[in-house]
């Protein structure tokens, strides 16, 4: 056979092999956008395996969740120009979370928010908690739910739903009772991230569990959230002292910088609030039914985030303590007001505030709540 003929055959074979390889790559990419859930190893901590789960809906929107802290690490969706980016703060690797950032995307508990001086009573029993926020207990203590490795169970490979469970043992961080808690994340084809919380205990305890995602609808931390417009369906809020513990009062927002009953830019009156917003809003809810409580909009991306919940309150926090010392995985500094939180909850320090809705959970009772974050683009 002539050399030219052999050369031609080699060229044809190379083209065929390349074509096959390209097809394989394309097929893999298509599989990754199918509705469902995938799992990837993400490291170890405390001798336990940590995984990263990717939930994908029919529109290709993806939410990534780790069983470390039951943490939402990213929520990637397209903006009005069809450019995808994540609307929540997070890291690409476990090491970012082990460095103890400010609860990015984590589930916080056993008691989210603050308990004054780390103490409370149930009947005549006095409980003393680990204090990790000055003289107060914050978000469950030194090693709360956000720093635990949870057990994770996908609903199925074809369903974008993940359930995580954790046993908080009696005495953990000072809290009484063996508490079995579970969190189920579901990403719907309507771009809703549903978060369902449930818990039972074998001894009277207190519980206030929430998700601590930091949102920036522009998808870029270089842009402040002060230009986002916000509506909160709350006629009242709970004023706080200098350590951010509620005074026990419930005050009207009317005529104050806390009035978001009609949508306004977050930055419009933030200068009149010492340190920025970090307050609980008393939602206009008569019962525990699921209802819309927040609408957040960004004109740059065209994104709108609606929040629905069964909870009586929401903590609106404008990232006041972000100071540029933490950077994204891409190396961008996360400065003050680079993101904001909308933490659905019972009120801070409720165990010490008899006028607030109770957070007491008794044996034989089952705690259940649901919060839905719905994303849309115009």
What are these regions (language model features)?
Residues 12-13, 222:
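Alpha-helical transmembrane segments and their juxtamembrane interfaces
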Residues 21-378:
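An exposed, glycine/acidic-rich loop-and-rim segment of catalytic or binding clefts
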Residues 6-12:
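Sec-dependent N-terminal signal peptides
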Residues 16-19:
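C-terminal motif of bacterial Sec signal peptides marking the signal peptidase cleavage site
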Residues 1-6, 21-22:
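Positively charged n-region of N-terminal signal peptides that target proteins for export
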């Amino acid at each position: 056979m002539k050399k030219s003929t052999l050369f031609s055959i080699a060229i044809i074979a190379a083209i065929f092999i390349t074509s096959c390889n390209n097809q394989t790559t394309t097929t893999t990419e298509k599989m990754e956008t199918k509705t469902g859930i995938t799992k990837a190893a993400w490291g170890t901590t405390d001798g336990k395996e940590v995984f990263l789960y990717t939930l994908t809906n029919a529109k290709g929107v993806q939410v990534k969740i780790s069983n470390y802290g039951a943490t939402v690490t990213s929520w990637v969706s397209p903006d009005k120009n069809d450019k995808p980016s994540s609307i929540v703060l997070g890291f690409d690797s476990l090491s970012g979370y082990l460095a103890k950032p400010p609860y990015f995307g984590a589930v916080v508990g056993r008691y989210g928010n603050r308990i004054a001086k780390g103490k409370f009573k149930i009947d005549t029993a006095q409980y003393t908690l680990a204090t990790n926020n000055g003289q107060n207990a914050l978000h469950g203590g030194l090693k709360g739910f956000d720093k635990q490795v949870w057990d994770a169970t996908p609903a199925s490979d074809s369903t974008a739903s993940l359930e995580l469970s954790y046993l908080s043992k009696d005495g953990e961080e000072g809290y009484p009772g063996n508490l079995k808690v579970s969190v189920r994340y579901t990403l719907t084809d309507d771009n809703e991230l549903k978060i369902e919380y449930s818990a039972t205990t074998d001894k009277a305890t207190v519980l206030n569990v929430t998700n601590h995602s930091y949102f920036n609808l522009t998808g870029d931390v270089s842009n402040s959230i002060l230009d986002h417009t916000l509506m909160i369906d709350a006629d009242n809020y709970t004023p706080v002292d200098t350590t951010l513990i509620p005074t026990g009062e419930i005050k009207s927002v009317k005529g104050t910088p806390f009035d978001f009953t009609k949508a306004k830019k977050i930055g419009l009156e933030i200068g009149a609030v010492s340190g920025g917003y970090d307050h609980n809003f008393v939602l206009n809810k008569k019962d525990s039914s699921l209802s819309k409580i927040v609408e957040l909009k960004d004109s740059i991306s065209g994104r709108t985030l609606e929040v629905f919940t069964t909870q009586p309150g929401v903590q609106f926090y404008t990232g006041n303590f972000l100071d540029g010392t933490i950077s994204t995985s891409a190396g961008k500094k996360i400065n003050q007001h680079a993101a904001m939180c909308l933490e659905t909850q019972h009120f801070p320090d409720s165990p010490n505030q008899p006028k607030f809705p109770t957070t007491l959970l008794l044996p034989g009772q089952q705690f259940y709540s649901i919060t839905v974050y719905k994303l849309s683009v115009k």
